[in-house]
């Protein structure tokens, strides 16, 4: 091909849809507008197949304009210069590690990037967001579109915080790419959608649950990160006191009965159930679950997922499971009377049933089941115990700062202010990303039902009476929090934050 000097590139009044940058650079092809005429510029030794693909992309045949190597590179840079040269370097250098905010600033504002499947800056940005979230042990990533801005927030250790504010124009690109990764319908923006992404990051398998929601300013996306390693925990990893761990271990090894775990959303109930199942999973038991959704896949355990579209409810799944000769049954949540009745009957016919309830206290679970319509005499016969729990942030061991408790703190902790204990406060360092906390642990109230508690339930005693008896046999959830404060694991503020109703 003959080469021509670099022409003056005039920005067209209505620029055509450009070739994706990676294709243009790799194949040596570029759309140019010269004197109101569109050309397909090409560097030496370009492949005919690439020319044909570019013509197809343009939707019409464009005349060819041959350029030398240097001239082509200058034209390429000039054509994409408003994307910034940093963004072009970004598309090439896939292996580089870049600052998240800088990465967001470098992403070009062009829908053409969606044509790329492997090295688009928008994909690099999403990968960087996911990688940073996993490094910080975030449980959720929020992409929130407002009228004039786009915000990315992480929920780390139960607390939501803003980490990035990309250009508002990137909202549609980010949402579309996430939808592609989660195999959702990218054209459907009027209704909520749910999907799933599986990744391997740094040797760790991570599942991501994706939820989209239409809003006034565009779709909002929340990604729930599920670390598959968390499904391999056992009871020793949950931060229980020695007393609670031993009692819990004894309780889950009972041949039949119901054990409930209670607490608000995000308090670690599912993790506790999985740890209990892992403890029991010794190949001598048939363990089956019905969940919504399956958060972690457990080897050697049969797991079934609720599917409302085909009327596969907790109750229906539980009925089916009971025909599969189970020893242990885990029901993700008891939401209605039907599920509760089946669970109680299963426990009375020789099965161990584990499940969760959304109540604030351990004894509150009994009241909730009675309110659902379960007869107290059935509960008194079937219930083994209830574990109430919350999650508190753990102080960063590298920077936590000791200090003497003041009078108010001594009163909260139930200690003599004349001899104030040494407590610790959050400070912040590089190890914990300046947050002062690293990770979370549970605080618990385990009520194992004895004969007296069963008689109280059978006689329909008040919740206050049952609570008073529970306090005689073990600490409350706030008592367990106080213990962790005195041990330097967490702070008074954290315990108060999660136990305000106590």
Swiss-Prot record:
Its EC number is 7.4.2.8. It is found in: Cell inner membrane. Residues 461-480 are annotated as: Disordered. Its main location: membrane. Induction: By the two quorum-sensing circuits LasR-LasI and RhlR-RhlI in a growth-phase dependent manner. CDD domains: PulE-GspE-like. One of its GO terms (biological process) is protein secretion by the type II secretion system. GO terms for cellular component: plasma membrane; type II protein secretion system complex. ATP binds at residues 263-270. Keywords: ATP-binding, Cell inner membrane, Cell membrane, Membrane, Metal-binding, Nucleotide-binding, Protein transport, Translocase, Transport, Zinc. Disruption phenotype: Mutants show complete loss of extracellular exotoxin A secretion. Zn(2+) binds at residues 396, 399, 429, 432. The keyword ATP-binding applies. Signal peptide: none annotated. It catalyses: ATP + H2O + cellular proteinSide 1 = ADP + phosphate + cellular proteinSide 2. InterPro entries: GSPE_N1E, P-loop_NTPase, T2SS/T4SS_dom, T2SS_E_N_sf, T2SS_GspE. Pfam families: GSPE_N1E (PF22341), T2SSE (PF00437). Its cofactor is Zn(2+). Belongs to the GSP E family. ATPase component of the type II secretion system required for the energy-dependent secretion of extracellular factors such as proteases and toxins from the periplasm. Acts as a molecular motor to provide the energy that is required for assembly of the pseudopilus and the extrusion of substrates generated in the cytoplasm. Homodimer. Dimerization is directed by a relatively short domain near the extreme N-terminus and is essential for extracellular protein secretion. May form homooligomers. Interacts with XcpY/GspL. Forms an inner membrane platform subcomplex with XcpS/GspF, XcpY/GspL and XcpZ/GspM. This is Type II secretion system protein E. It comes from Pseudomonas aeruginosa (strain ATCC 15692 / DSM 22644 / CIP 104116 / JCM 14847 / LMG 12228 / 1C / PRS 101 / PAO1). The gene is xcpR.
């Amino acid at each position: 091909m003959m080469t021509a000097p670099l022409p003056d590139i005039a920005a067209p009044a209505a620029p055509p849809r450009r070739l994706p940058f990676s294709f243009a650079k790799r194949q040596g092809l570029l759309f140019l507008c010269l004197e109101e005429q569109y050309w397909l510029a090409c560097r030496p030794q370009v492949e005919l197949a690439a020319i044909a693909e570019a013509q197809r992309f343009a939707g019409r045949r464009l005349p060819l304009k041959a350029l030398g190597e240097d001239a082509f590179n200058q034209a390429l840079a000039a054509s994409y210069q408003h994307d910034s040269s940093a963004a072009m370097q970004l598309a090439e250098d896939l292996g580089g590690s870049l600052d998240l905010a800088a990465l967001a600033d470098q992403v070009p504002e062009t829908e053409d990037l969606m044509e790329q499947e492997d090295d688009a800056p928008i994909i690099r940005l999403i990968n960087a967001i996911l990688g940073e979230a996993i490094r910080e042990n975030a449980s959720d990533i929020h992409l929130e579109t407002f009228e004039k801005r786009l915000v990315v927030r992480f929920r780390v250790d139960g607390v939501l915080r803003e980490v990035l504010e990309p250009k508002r124009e990137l909202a549609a690109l980010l949402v579309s790419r996430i939808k592609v990764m989660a195999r959702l319908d990218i054209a459907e923006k009027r209704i909520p959608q749910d999907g799933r992404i599986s990744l391997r990051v740094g040797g760790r398998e991570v599942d991501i649950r994706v939820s989209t929601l239409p809003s006034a300013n565009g779709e909002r996306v929340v990604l729930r990160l599920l670390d598959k390693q968390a499904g391999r925990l056992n009871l020793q990893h949950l931060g229980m006191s020695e007393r609670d761990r031993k009692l819990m271990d004894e309780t889950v090894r009972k041949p039949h009965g119901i054990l409930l775990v209670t607490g608000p959303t995000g308090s670690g109930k599912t993790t506790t159930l999985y740890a209990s199942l892992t403890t029991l999973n010794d190949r001598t038991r048939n363990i089956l679950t019905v969940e919504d959704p399956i958060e972690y896949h457990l080897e050697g355990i049969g797991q079934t997922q609720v599917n409302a579209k085909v009327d596969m409810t907790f109750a229906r799944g539980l009925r089916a499971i009971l025909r599969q000769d189970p020893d242990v049954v885990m029901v993700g949540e008891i939401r209605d009377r039907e599920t509760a009745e089946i669970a109680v009957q299963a426990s009375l016919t020789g099965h161990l049933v584990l499940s969760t309830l959304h109540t604030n206290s351990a004894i509150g679970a009994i009241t909730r089941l009675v309110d659902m319509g379960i007869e107290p005499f059935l509960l008194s016969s079937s219930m083994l115990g209830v574990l109430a729990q919350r999650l508190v942030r753990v102080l960063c061991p590298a920077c936590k700062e000791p200090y003497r408790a003041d009078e108010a703190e001594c009163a909260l902790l139930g200690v003599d202010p004349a001899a104030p204990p040494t407590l610790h406060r959050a400070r912040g360092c590089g190890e914990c990303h300046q947050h002062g906390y690293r990770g979370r642990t549970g605080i618990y109230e385990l009520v194992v039902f004895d004969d007296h508690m069963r008689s109280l339930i059978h006689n329909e005693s008040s919740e206050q009476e049952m609570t008073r008896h529970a306090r005689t046999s073990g600490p409350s959830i706030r008592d367990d929090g106080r213990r962790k404060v005195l041990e330097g694991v967490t702070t008074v503020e954290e315990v108060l934050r999660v136990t305000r109703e106590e």
